Amino acid sequence: MSKVTFRADDDLVAAVEDLDASKSEVMRNALRAYLTTHAAADDVPVESVNTPVRGAATDAQKDVNVTIRVSSPSAVEEVRTTPASGGRADAEEPGDDGETDAEHADTSATGDESVCSQCGAELSADHVYCPNCGGKATHRVFCECGDEIRADWAFCPRCGRRTVSGDALDSA
């Protein structure tokens, strides 16, 4: 059994001494009675987690999942400049005109200035990372030997190792 010390004013100590039981027994019984009544009141939750805050959600209040896919930097500009009609942006997807991603990359990278693929900020030729969002400006591919290779090459011309893109092309 542990020892508990109580501090009380003189009137309370005198009232406890006037009782027939010992001070320790009186204080134990008082503490048990207090904990029993207050613990029972504390066990009842004030609010239930399952209690709805608002009423049942209507169709207009339900969550909506939105997926935005940007396949080129120019698509970012199209989405930004396209006005939304009725809460819905009907931006034309790039690539619908039959142009492949590789052709689009070749046409957009003709000048010294390029555009960040993540945020659309203009990048100069010496930028490795976008100064606006920190996204990688150049997506250069290197072989395990350290030589820079093109992403569409299946083998490294320096060491002859098979590249990751070569493995992907082989399995396709």
Curated annotation (Swiss-Prot):
GO cellular component: cytoplasm
Coiled-coil ranges (or none): none
One Gene Ontology term from the biological process aspect of the record: cell division
Region Disordered, residue ranges: 72-113
Keywords noted in UniProt: Cell cycle, Cell division, Cytoplasm, DNA-binding, Metal-binding, Transcription, Transcription regulation, Zinc, Zinc-finger
Major location (coarse): cytoplasm
GO MF annotation terms: DNA binding; zinc ion binding
Pfam families according to UniProt: DZR
Locations listed in the record: Cytoplasm
UniProt zinc finger (DZANK-type) residues: 116-160
Protein function: Transcriptional regulator involved in the control of cell division. Is a specific and direct regulator of the cdrS-ftsZ2 operon. Acts by binding to the promoter region upstream of the operon. The CdrSL-FtsZ2 transcriptional network might coordinate cell division timing with cell growth.
Protein family according to the UniProt entry: Belongs to the CdrL family.
Name this protein carries in UniProt: Transcriptional regulator CdrL
Taxonomic path: Archaea, Methanobacteriati, Methanobacteriota, Stenosarchaea group, Halobacteria
Gene name in the database record: cdrL
